[in-house]
Amino acid sequence: FAEVGSTVIDNSSAWRMDKTKKLIVPEVNGNDLTIDDKIIANPNCSTIQMLIALAPIHIKYGITRIIVSTYQSITGTGRIAVNQLNNEYNNIEGEMAYKYPIHQNAIPQCDEFEDNGYTKEEMKLINETHKILDPNISVTATAVRVPVIGGHSESINLTLEKSFQIDDIKKLLSESNGIKLEDDTRNFKYPMPIYAKGKDDVCLLYTSDAAD
């Protein structure tokens, strides 16, 4: 398709780390595209939601380190995983998507382990962040599969280059595209996958300032 002039958006991992192709999150680096980009790579789902939240902060304050832990829906594995969860809940034997039960469990493995000890999912978070946001950011990632249908969650700890105030960051995020700030903790209002299901926004809770 690309050879005959069509523009192709590829959702697989085939082109993501290809040096000749751009890895695009529209809210983050969509302006990098030109009319000559006929194959556009789409990042991993966990990378997309993280960078939508972090890009505005990086632009203004400079991120030097990211520590991210993901709690990923079984839908990322596919229908077979949803069937496994439902079967286990109803005490029915069936095909297993994972090597272990997922009902009432958390599995610290998303995709295969690589020689460096990280899983492929964790390396996607690291490598894609470097390609899209900044190759100089130190990134540590942990990915966990949890018995949830419909939404990935992430806990992210940042080290910033410039000094900041929490209220300024909250204002920045609330004014950014693709982000819904939900941080009314006194009234128990915060992001949860059950309420994010079917929505496009990244639901965000900014909790604490460890600068001091």
PLM region spans:
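Rossmann-fold NAD(P)-binding glycine/threonine-rich loop
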Residues: A2-I35
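General beta-strand structural signal in soluble alpha/beta enzymes
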Residues: V8-N11, M17, I40-N42, I67-T70, ...
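Catalytic helix-loop patch of NAD(P)-dependent Rossmann-fold dehydrogenases
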Residues: V28-G62
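Active-site-lining helix/loop region of Rossmann-like oxidoreductase modules
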Residues: I48, A55-L172
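A common structural junction motif
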Residues: D168, L173-E182
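C-terminal hydrophobic structural anchor segments
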Residues: G178-A196
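Short, low-order "capping/linker" segments at domain edges
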Residues: P193-L205
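Conserved small/polar residues in nucleotide/adenosyl-binding loops
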Residues: Y206-D212
